[in-house]
């Protein structure tokens, strides 16, 4: 039987796996712990981590992966990219910071970017 400290250590290692600044739990569905690590696509998260490393900006991930019950609660359509872990909603206040983030996303080859006053 595994020790609780060992399990916590493994979860902590997984939480940062492949990332420099972000952690996988930032992308968890609010109702399902560790879902960000299990269900998020690796590519968008790693791209975002590279942008943060390059431009030294701080972001707040508002929405990453969402489970079916949580998506139903938010009334997200069945084909919503958050349901399959391919989308990230980021709170980004300030024109300069927002433009820096969008520029970084475009330079990394992202084609689908939604921008509003406070979110990317």
Give the positions of each predicted feature.
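N-terminal start-of-chain detector that recognizes signal peptides
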Residues: 32-34, 59-65, 93-97
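Generic structural signal for short, solvent-exposed loop/turn connectors between secondary structure elements
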Residues: 36-37, 56, 75-77, 92-94, ...
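Extended, low-complexity, intrinsically disordered C-terminal regulatory tails
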Residues: 45-76
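Catalytic cores and adjacent binding grooves of peptidoglycan-active enzymes
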Residues: 80-86, 91-120
């Amino acid at each position: 039987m595994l020790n609780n400290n060992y399990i916590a250590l493994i979860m902590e290692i997984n939480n940062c796996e492949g990332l420099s600044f972000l952690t996988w739990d930032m992308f968890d569905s609010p109702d399902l712990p560790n879902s960000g690590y299990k269900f998020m696509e690796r590519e968008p998260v790693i791209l975002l981590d590279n942008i943060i490393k390059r431009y030294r900006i701080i972001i707040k991930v508002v929405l990453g992966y969402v489970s079916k019950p949580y998506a139903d609660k938010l009334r997200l359509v069945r084909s919503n990219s958050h349901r399959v872990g391919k989308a990230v909603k980021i709170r980004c206040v300030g024109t300069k910071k927002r433009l820096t983030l969008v520029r970084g996303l475009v330079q990394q080859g992202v084609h689908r970017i939604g921008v509003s006053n406070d979110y990317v």
